[in-house]
Amino acid sequence: MTTRQQMKSEFVGTALKKSPLSRNQIAAVSGLSNAYIRELEKGGIGNVGREKLIAFAIALNLSLTEIDDMLRVFDRAALAEDDIPVFIQASERSRISAALHPIRDSFTFDIAILSAERIPGDHVIVSPRPASCLRAEGHRAYAEKSLAAAHRLYADLVEAINRERRKQLMANLADHAVRQFVCINCLTDYIRECTDAEEKRWRQRHVRNAVNIISSFERYEFYLTRECPSFIFVMRTPPPDSGISEKLIITVLPPHRLQVRTSGLLAGFATDNHAVILNFKEELTFIRESIIEDYLDRQKLIDFLVELSD
């Protein structure tokens, strides 16, 4: 084994050992076979495609800086704007498995959600605010400016993923329902308790963007609830005849958080485990019972959201 092969082998071996995922999970998320990953670990592949390296790095939960390190070890240039489509394409190959898959970093979490959102089917969102993909262009870059400052690609990458998620949302609404459940107190605090003037303007635009979707798409059902859910989660339910299992993405958002400052924090989990999904369906049953009936009237709902965002 040459020195260069040894470096590649050691880098991949260390990354695999640090990963909380099994080999099968890494293969499922990256779209690479176990056999290919074993050859990478041995340093036995002389010319590894850039796209495969990035997909592998995403599955390993590497930060953007760590992905740069991997690319350099494999004699590739650091990440650049031209690589953004590769991250988007990685969401097409990624598969969510029955194991509980931990996800670190906002951009990796977004890719996991996008991979689920690409599957046609009914969509449930339980959160304290409108769907994150409805944030205006530039909001992510501001709210996560510390991460944007840490890596030159970060802001453009998360905005590009957000655009693709909005595109998938619109496409899905053509044939399937999207049901969002939002705690009215959390949503009110999201706007009124924000002390950062610029962030508040971004949040107001976020709510107005939700109003535009509610006004334009009958299949977008937005419910205000009295109860604050235990978890924030997204559930995708493909048609029964599709043969595709339901997908679940879980996260917890600290109510006081304004700026995301640290890379590497646990962002959430993804799974298609039936038993886990059944528990969240039971949670959804309780959430439905707390829907505020006054705002089932679509115009009253819109009026409330417009007033809140002014």
Where are the language model's segments positioned?
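Hydrophobic protein-protein interaction segments
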Residues: 102-308
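Short alpha-helical "recognition helix" segments of helix-turn-helix
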Residues: 22-29, 56
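Short amphipathic recognition helices of helix-turn-helix/homeodomain-type DNA-binding modules
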Residues: 51-54, 58-100
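Recognition helix of helix-turn-helix/homeodomain-like DNA-binding domains
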Residues: 31-48, 55, 72-73
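Short, charged amphipathic recognition helices of the HTH superfamily
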Residues: 18-25, 49-50, 80
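A short, Lys/Arg-rich alpha-helix, primarily the initiator
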Residues: 1-22
